[in-house]
UniProtKB/Swiss-Prot annotation:
Domain of life: Bacteria
InterPro entries named in the record: P-loop_NTPase (IPR027417), Thymidylate_kin-like_dom (IPR039430), Thymidylate_kin_CS (IPR018095), Thymidylate_kinase (IPR018094)
Lineage of source species: Bacteria, Bacillati, Bacillota, Bacilli, Bacillales
Protein name stated in the entry: Thymidylate kinase
Pfam families, A to Z: Thymidylate_kin
Biological processes, Gene Ontology terms: dTDP biosynthetic process; dTTP biosynthetic process; dUDP biosynthetic process
SUPFAM superfamilies: P-loop containing nucleoside triphosphate hydrolases
Length: 208
């Protein structure tokens, strides 16, 4: 498969979405064929699943149900949007991918990173990113950012306890150690322009 698949990961409030809105015009202005997308979502079916996953009222959702819904949304998104873009030799910038499931459901929910990884290997047919940027930030800082962002609608995961969000970060740090070949850690607790500059350099090194 051609193209370059780049995923942006991080806990709540790490600045993933903001980063992608900065990266997209930069690469477009460079003449690079590029698309930006997100998980869960990116296409109609997966956006419907996103609505279910984020609905604040669904506090009784069981961990396996949650993991399976994310995997289902991921599969459809991959087949319908990501794979065709890669085949067309495009740069794909994706807000979240498999590592989110490993950190949130595998580690923080206690399903086991290996179990959730195998579930997602089935869903993705081992289609993995060439580069993953992990935006690391303390959960207290990330959640404080969310509280200050009046434009952001609070979702079901935002409402989890601080203990849960600490587990998410712990999970991510374990995943970083496991997949050092493709995951690069970027400090998200710094001005966004610094983050953007650092990430652009990382992506451009892969495009050479």
């Amino acid at each position: 498969m051609k193209g370059l698949f780049v995923t942006i990961e991080g806990p709540e409030g790490s600045g993933k979405s903001t980063l992608i809105t900065k990266l997209l015009p930069y690469f477009e202005n460079k003449g690079q064929k590029v698309i930006a997308t997100r998980e869960p979502g990116g296409i109609a079916i997966s956006e419907e699943i996103r609505t279910i996953l984020h609905k604040k009222e669904y506090t009784t959702m069981e961990a396996r149900t949650e993991a399976l819904l994310y995997a289902a949304a991921r599969r459809q998104h991959l087949v319908e949007k990501v794979m065709p873009a890669l085949e067309a030799d495009q740069l794909v910038l994706c807000d979240r991918f498999i590592d989110s499931s490993l950190a949130y459901q595998g580690y923080a929910r206690g399903l086991g990173i290996d179990k959730v990884y195998e579930m997602n290997r089935f869903a993705t047919e081992d289609c993995m990113p060439s580069l993953t940027i992990y935006l690391d930030i303390a959960p207290e800082v990330g959640l404080a950012r969310i509280e200050k962002d009046a434009a952001r609608e609070v979702n079901r995961l935002d409402m989890e306890s601080i203990a849960f969000h600490r587990l998410v970060r712990e999970g991510y740090l374990q995943i970083v150690e496991r997949f050092k070949d493709r995951i690069v850690v970027v400090n998200a607790d710094q001005p966004m322009e610094n983050v953007v500059e650092e990430v652009i350099q990382l992506i451009e090194s892969k495009l050479l």
